[in-house]
Structure formats: C-alpha cells, structure tokens
C-alpha cells in the first residue's frame, strides 16, 4: 500500500509526525557561523563623523552599510578585490527573524541575477567563493541569503521559516536593487530546492534551477512512499506543477543523500521542465566538478529562456 510496510503505516497513522518534526530530523544542520555582519557608521549630515548607530536601521532591514567579516572556516579563495564586490546586509522576515543577505556583483550590467538558496550544513561565508566563481562563469550576479538559524540569521530553522526567509530575500532583491522578476533566476540546491519551488510556484520569474532536489521529506525518509500525506514536509512534488517559468533539473545518478529518483519524479511532474541534466556517476555534493554542469547552465541561460529566444 503506497510502498510502505504494514508496520510503517501503523506507526505513521497511530503516531503521525508533524511536518516540523520531519523537517527538523531530515534537513537542518546549521554549521558554526563562518562570518558576521559588521555595521559601518555612515557620515552624519555635517560630513565628517559618524551618525548614531540607529541610523543604520538594522532591525528593519532598511538600507545601511555593512561589512562582511569572514572567519578562517569560510576558506575564502579570492583576493580582497573580489571580497570588495560582495555586499551584505540584514533584512527581516514576516516571521520576525533577521535574515542575512549577500549580493555578489560579478558582471557589470548583467542581464540576470541568480537568487541562490544553498544546501545544508553551509552558510553564506562558506558559499561566498563559489558564488563569485559561478557568477563570473555564467555572467550573472548572485544574490543569496541564510536560512533562519544559519550564519548570522536569527531564529531557528524550520519549514515555515524557509518560506518566510526566501520571501524576505525576494523582496529585498526587488526593492533594494530594483531587479524585476523577469531578470531573476531562482536556483535551489538540495534543501534549498524547497523554498525555491515554493516561491516559484507563487511568482513568475526568468527561470528556475533545481539542483539535487527532493520530492518530499517523507519520500527521503521512506523511499518507497508514493503518496503525499497531510503530515509530509517539503512537498515539492505537489508544487512543482504550479511553476510557470522554465525549469532546469540537475541530479547526479549516484546521489547518496537524495536519490536520483527524486529528480526524475520532479521532471516528470513539471510541465515547464526543459531538457534535464543527469550527471552520470555524480553524487550529492560534487556535481559542480563535472564539466557538463557549467555547460548545461550556460546553454540554459543563453539559449533557452524566453527573453533569449525573442
């Protein structure tokens, strides 16, 4: 019955877990923070000198000047020049959490900005080098954020917070930088595909990339599950059909964390999916090392988006 054993079904229906508990057990492993956001006082009306710290309006997430301080654990691979291209600031989610945001200006006048939702067990500090390299190679700017409880973001990680966090990032990207939806590519990796699919199912954008995606929390915990239960967490499989933007799905055939079958199932359920990238022999965390990864992304962005075909 739906791929679950009798004992598993009895356990589920007699003591069904809530989505939050499934999410917490399956997904969230925030690392020790590898960075901090340091407020920089702005000049007062008289020019020299600093305005009171309150003028930074950090609690509201309004524009202010912030400096990125990386620890050694961030393992930054570039020079101070590249570090200076990174802008950081906090914003606030609808659930009241401070959400740390990062904007990497890789290419002057870039046509697209990638809103990147990263995977598990990393934060913005650890991802900063990757963002610089990816944006430079794709000729896109990169905007990212940390989930509640990750990096310098406050609160605790949860499914509901994931959705509020990406909403806050989306609004910050649009209002602070004036980026229109048709210039935003939503990119989710692993657990980051959860907020990405949710946002893409509600807003149209230039494109969507799902990198090592999961279909749902229950299907990760119980691989034979065929049905989405009311207590399931991260139900990407039920939302992906609502996406109206072009979707590129990328998955490694030897993924040891989220089985390759998840990528296949989402591809089959998504009417806006383009030709996927199945990376033969790749696992969960090494797809970026294969040459076809960048090749497929470049072709998707340069040739397959509606604005490029016009």
UniProtKB/Swiss-Prot annotation:
Membrane topology, from the record: Lipid-anchor
EC number annotated for this UniProt entry: 3.1.2.22
Active site: 190 (charge relay system), 255 (charge relay system), 284 (charge relay system)
Species whose genome carries this gene: Homo sapiens (Human)
Keyword Lipid metabolism belongs to the record: no
Description of activity control: Inhibited by palmostatin-B.
UniProt protein name: Alpha/beta hydrolase domain-containing protein 17A
Class in the EC hierarchy, top level: hydrolase
One term under GO cellular component: endosome membrane
